[in-house]
From Swiss-Prot:
Gene: DFG5
Regulation: induction: Induced by caspofungin. Expression is also regulated by SPF1.
Glycosylation (residues): N86, N111, N135, N203, N243, N268, N402
Record's protein name: Mannan endo-1,6-alpha-mannosidase DFG5
GO cellular component: extracellular region; fungal-type cell wall; plasma membrane; side of membrane
Phenotypic consequence of gene deletion: Leads to decreased caspofungin sensitivity.
Maturation and modification: The GPI-anchor is attached to the protein in the endoplasmic reticulum and serves to target the protein to the cell surface. There, the glucosamine-inositol phospholipid moiety is cleaved off and the GPI-modified mannoprotein is covalently attached via its lipidless GPI glycan remnant to the 1,6-beta-glucan of the outer cell wall layer. N-mannosylated.
Classification of source organism: Eukaryota, Fungi, Dikarya, Ascomycota, Saccharomycotina
Membrane association type: Lipid-anchor; GPI-anchor
Protein species of origin: Candida albicans (strain SC5314 / ATCC MYA-2876)
């Protein structure tokens, strides 16, 4: 068995070359992988799993558990397309993802009950789905597919028909602030996973029905609307007070991404032009709002330099979803590819900061590092590069593994909104304060964006 020290040395030896900036040829896979290698080095700099006393699968604060899910999804793609012969990298990714699966293998580890929401579980589900669709090294006990099915089943079981006519709440646990808030990203993750599982397994009865249920609810509640110009607008969410009628008017790239790619998966699987139309509408809305001069930006906060740590990572999932959409709905490829190329070139030029000379920044439009750094900057840069070389995801029909369990997760208590864990009053109070801060940032965002 490889020791922690050996793993650390091996991974560091991957990146011994000295580089002061990243050059990238967007038409050359080797060039993209070469640049991405240094971005991945920056990701590992934040990793706690190689540090003495650190937690396997987690990244340094202020990054949350869900940020780790973002990172590992991109690392699976980097391994698959750029370094599939690197056994050290393979073990690091495998150990990190498997270690965070939780006691019931549904990505609800009890030690994350103070912060984990439905969206967090969903993001990890998306990461594990990357492993499924890339035939990444399988665990012996529970397959990646079984674990994604457990994520889907536990999320779907929390569908709350008693408030706002349906939908998922933001939070899983009743003691977390934000439990009274329903948001688009949580429901988007459920929609997205349903679409991917439908295509992968070939089973339409449960998964397509769930995707259609989520889409209809999003329209009915007013979280997803069509504007006069035909573009789709996806709002952040609303408190359940007054039937979710007071909608928070904030738009985030990753929310658009999960719905966009979900529609593309459904179109690819069903052949129904309704899903192609919806894909095209979200693509057009995304191109209109989240790009300036073809360069990707988190428009709701970035131009004002107001993005928080979470928001600075949203383009990670957005980029991944754009890449997947080009493969599943080829009709969108030319439009998306153009902006991905420009954004990847800008991201590479931003990766020219820090003491290593390749630390990535937030602003991809200025041809240099902007002084901003963090895990989100690294994962976003990685994903926009990987989106250029992504290949069609596997399914059971095209060579994917089929260790499936359609009932996975249904026998645990984690599918309930009220989870009976032994939590102290002090822990609940701390969780409430922590989540309240995040909710305040979301709901208060519209105020500072005016100025």
């Amino acid at each position: 068995m490889v020791s922690l020290q050996q793993l650390t040395i091996s991974i560091l030896l991957l990146f011994t070359a000295s580089v002061q900036s990243l050059d990238i040829n967007v038409d050359d896979k080797d060039s993209i992988c070469s640049a991405a290698k240094y971005v991945v080095q920056g990701i590992w700099n934040y990793y706690e799993g190689l540090k003495y006393g650190g937690t396997v699968g987690m990244f340094a604060p202020p990054n949350y558990w869900w940020n780790a899910g973002e990172a590992f999804g991109g690392l699976v793609d980097f391994y698959t397309y750029c370094q599939s012969d690197n056994s050290t990298l393979e073990k690091l990714i495998y150990n990190g993802m498997y270690h965070q699966a939780g006691e019931n293998y549904n990505y609800i580890p009890s030690n994350q009950s103070m912060t984990e929401g439905n969206d967090d579980q969903g993001v990890w589900g998306m990461a594990i789905m990357e492993a499924v669709e890339r035939n990444f090294t399988e665990p012996e006990s529970h397959s990646w597919l079984e674990m994604v099915q457990a994520v889907f089943n536990t999320m779907n079981a929390r569908w709350d028909a008693d408030n706002c006519g349906g939908g998922l709440r933001w939070q899983i646990f009743t003691w977390n602030s934000g439990y009274d808030y329903k948001n688009s990203i949580s429901n988007g993750c459920l929609f997205h996973l349903a679409a991917r599982l439908a295509r992968y397994t070939g089973n339409s009865s449960v998964y397509v029905d769930t995707a259609e249920k989520v889409w209809k609810w999003m329209e009915d509640v007013g979280f997803l609307t069509e504007e006069d110009n035909g573009d789709v607008r996806i709002y952040d969410g609303a408190k359940i007070t007054n039937n979710c009628s007071s909608v928070t008017d904030l738009r985030w790239s990753y929310t658009y991404g999960v719905f966009m790619a979900g529609c593309a998966y459904l179109y690819n699987f069903t052949g129904d032009d309704v899903w192609l139309t919806r894909t095209n509408e979200i693509v057009q809305a995304s191109l209109s709002y989240f790009f300036a001069n073809k360069i990707m930006q988190e428009t709701t906060c970035q131009p004002q330099n107001k993005c928080n740590n979470d928001q600075r990572s949203f383009r990670c999932l957005f980029s991944r979803c754009l890449g997947l959409t080009t493969q599943l709905a080829p009709e969108t490829k030319d439009r998306i590819r153009e902006v991905l190329e420009a954004s990847a070139e800008g991201a590479a030029k931003s990766c020219s900061g820090g003491s290593d000379g390749v630390t990535c920044g937030e602003n991809w439009a200025i041809d240099k590092w902007d002084g901003v750094y963090g895990l989100g900057e690294q994962t976003s840069a990685l994903e926009v590069m990987m989106a250029l070389i992504v290949e069609p995801p596997l399914s059971v029909k095209t060579g994917g593994t089929n260790r499936t369990d359609y009932s996975a997760g249904t026998n645990s208590e984690d599918n309930a909104n009220k989870n009976e864990l032994t939590i102290t009053g002090k822990d609940k109070a701390g969780a409430g304060v922590l989540t309240a801060i995040v909710l305040a940032v979301i709901l208060g965002g519209a105020i500072w964006m005016i100025f």
